[in-house]
Amino acid sequence: MLKAADLTGALAEHYVPILKIILVTAFLTQKLHDRYGPVVRISPNHLSFTQPDAWKEIYGFQPSSKGSTEMNKSKIFSETVEELPKSIINADREEHQRLRRALAHGFSDASMREQEGMIIKYIDKLSDRLKEFADDGTSPQNMAGWYNWTTFDVAGDLIFGQSFQCLERADYHPWVAFIFGAIRFGSVMTSVKYIGLNFVVQALFKMGGMKAMSQVRENTDEMMQNRMRMTDDRNDLFEGLLKRRKEWNLSFDQLSANALILVLAGSETTATTLSGTTYLLLTHPEVYEKLKKEVRSAFKDSSEINIGSVSKLSYMLAVLNESLRLYPPVTSGIIREAPEGGCRIGGQHIPEGTLVEIQQWSSNHSPDNWPDPWKFDPERFLESEKTNVNRLDSLQAFSVGPRNCIGRK
C-alpha cells in the first residue's frame, strides 16, 4: 500500500499551501517530479502523478465493491462556497450525465457546422481590427487581449445569443473584466480552504465575495433572460439545455450557472492556447515557415478554410498538440479523492481519502514522457507509432473519462 506519508517531497507540505495562494503550485510540483520521480507528495494527504496510465486510473472509471465508478472530485476544490448554485462542474454523477446529454448536441459536428458561419464572422472581424490597429505591422499588439476579446465574443453569441462586443470596443466588456477578477479571487479562496480555513472562506464571501458574485450573477441572469426570450431555434451550445428545462425541472439559477461555466470554458482556455501557439511560432521561425507552406498549399483563398478542411492539415494539428503540451491552458490538475476501500494507481494501492491528481504542467514536461521536454518540436506527433519514443498518451489537454471536456472537438 502506498501512503502519502511514505513518499518524498516533504518540503512541499510546508510551502504548497502558501504557493497555491500565489498561483505557482504547478511549477513547484514539476520541479518535485524532476527530483523525486513520477509520484510525489505535495501536501500531507495529497499525491501528484505523471505516469500516462494514471490518467484513466484517476479520471476514468474504477472497479469497486459497488461496480464501476468514478472518483469523486474533492469538495475542497469543487465546492468552495456553499451558497453558489450547482453546475456541470460540481454536479454529482447522475446530474452530470443528465446535463452532459443535454449539451452534447450543441457540440456535435452537425451543430458546429451550422454555427461555422457565425464563428468565421468573428475571425474575420479579428483580422480586420488587427489590420486597423497594427499600422501595417509597425505597431505592437497584445495578442493575448485580442484572442480573449474574440473568444469571449464567440462564446457569448454561442451561449447567450449575443456578443460581448469586445472586438468592437477593442477592450473587455465590463462583465468579462470582472469575471477575471472573480476567478483570481476564487483561486485564493480555494487555497485558503485547502489549508483548513473554511470559516475564513465563508467570512470573506459574506464580507465582499457575495457582493462581487451578486454583480456577476446579475449580469449573467440578464443575458440568460434575453436568451430565453429568443423564439427562433438557434441550435447553439445552450439550446439542448433550454429545451429540457421544464422536463428536468431545471431552475433559472442552474441554467445561469451552467451558462457562465460554458462561457468561461469556451473562451479563456482557447485564447490561452492561441496565445501560446502564436508565441511559440514566432520564436521558432522554421516551424512557422513549414506551417505557412502547408496552409498556403492547401487552400487557394480563405473561403476554402472551414472546420472540415483544417482537420486535414496534419502539421497544423501537430503544432497545436505541441503547443498544448508546452503551454497548457490549465497547468494544474483536477483533484480527486480515492474512494472507499482505496484504489490502484500506477500499480500501487492508494488508501481511501487520499487526494490524487495529474498536473498537466508536470506531465507535459516530464522527461519520462517526452525526450527533451522543453523543446518545441511538432514532429513528435508525426512520427510513426513503432518508432515514436514520446508517450503521446500522456498529453490529455481535455482530460479523460466521463468528465472530460465536452468541447474537445
Regions found by a protein language model. Name each.
Residues E239, I358-K386:
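Conserved cytochrome P450 K-helix/beta-meander segment immediately N-terminal to the heme-binding cysteine loop
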Residues P17, I21-T29, E218, E304-G346:
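Conserved cytochrome P450 K-helix E-x-x-R motif and the immediately C-terminal K′/meander segment
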Residues L32, I42, I123, A155, ...:
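Structural signal for hydrophobic/aromatic residues that build the beta-strand cores
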Residues M1-R98, I120-K125, R129, T150, ...:
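N-terminal membrane-proximal hinge/A-helix region immediately C-terminal to the signal-anchor transmembrane segment
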Residues K66-V81, E114-L274, K290:
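Cytochrome P450 heme-thiolate monooxygenase catalytic core
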Residues Q51, L126, T273-T278, Q360:
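Hydrophobic, repeat-rich solenoid/adaptor surfaces of innate immune receptors and signaling proteins
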Residues T269-E294, R408-K409:
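Cytochrome P450 catalytic-core helices
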